[in-house]
UniProtKB/Swiss-Prot annotation:
It is a peripheral membrane protein. This is ATP synthase subunit beta. ATP binds at residues 158-165. Belongs to the ATPase alpha/beta chains family. The lineage of its organism: Bacteria, Pseudomonadati, Planctomycetota, Planctomycetia, Pirellulales.
Amino acid sequence: MSTATATGRVTQVIGSTFDAEFPEGQLPKIYNALTIQSEHKGVTIDLTGEVQQHLGGGRVRAIALGSTEGMMRGMNVVDTGKPVSVPVGKATLGRVFNVLGQPIDKRGDVQADDYWPIHRQAPPVNELSTNTELFETGIKVVDLLTPFVRGGKAGLFGGAGLGKTVILTELIARIASSHGGYSVFAGVGERTREGTDLWLEMQETEIGSTGRNVIEQTCMVFGQMNEPPGSRLRVALSALTMAEYFRDTTGADTLLFVDNIFRFSQAGSEVSALLGRMPSAVGYQPTLATEMGALQERITSTKQGAITSVQAVYVPADDPTDPAPATAFGQLDAFIYLERSISEKGIYPAIDPLASNSRILDPQYVGDRHYTIARRVQTILQRYRELQDIIAILGVDELSEEDKTIVHRARRIERFLSQPFLVAEVFIGKPGEITSLEDTIRSFEGICDGKYDHLPEQAFMYVGAIEQAEEQAKKMESK
């Protein structure tokens, strides 16, 4: 930990930004952390800021990483001489932090041996790993149509209330509970209640049959929606730095969950406006692509280890062409698009099987059988979607026999893509189902071949493998 290099004074406070003046020749570098510790009329101020601009004449403009309430001109500002640094290593496991790496779980200080700055370069190209391997999740629609890449990045795109956080929580419960490595969760600008629920859930979920809880292999970093934009902008970098340590020093496979990457862009927009930059399209910051690229390029797999990332992406007004989700979209290996019309049918997860995709849904990576079945499923659903207008006007009876069969099977496929989740057991009254990739492929192959045309549509709702649909059909007949 280096010592302070210079002391200046606050000259201006505007919202979540402040200006400070330093002696000649002692100007802090861009991204250096500044600290203000003061007490005035019984109000104690302990604030950290980050230098964003040099204004000339020894003045800098900084973004506050905490509340500026009570700040006054003339207060002393100390340049720490380095960027914000967070604790890294095994001492962080099981703990909950804020953007500065300070524990917020009321369990005492963190005895970390090392601290890393949150601003780091992405690994050089010659250090990157080029292996491509499917990462099985046990969720049918994901494994069949949008397979995740081990060491890759997957995005959950969706509007408000479509279940992004539920799917993300489910993936944590499934992957982290069967995963031997470390997990890092970044709560970026989302609800504090959801973060608390997740923390409590992780304390109860076991890692396989090891007898240990998921939280023991996880560290969590929060910058929630009630916090200043500077905190929400930098919290993803703090979490990523902790994940990078596990990747680079232990060589372990690391999982990085981010909820929500849109809030990162949103916070950047607020900071940009406070710094006086000219807004770009739809009011976003002109540096949107640069900031997103700098973050996403660090989330990668190297020869030392892998970071597999799952990121929730809020889609404003259900418009996927909005610059924030569109910028994130280009950085991902797999993208899952949540559709409101599917949610309205009561089918969850409300994943659109036609709009979602993955770069490894290719025979070269998943094999011919998997690829063929996935494309057959999508072809049937696509034809069903094309027939919707005709059905709405004329009814199913006016279709050809071939189209009637397609509609018949598409409705069963649509319902079979639903699945009971582990984290939703208390809401739907059914135990969560983890379906193996082989069972998923075999089940959909049977539906496409017409082996289960005799089963009622409702039997396919919220089951795992096809055998459960057959059991459900028998129960329905006996009633």
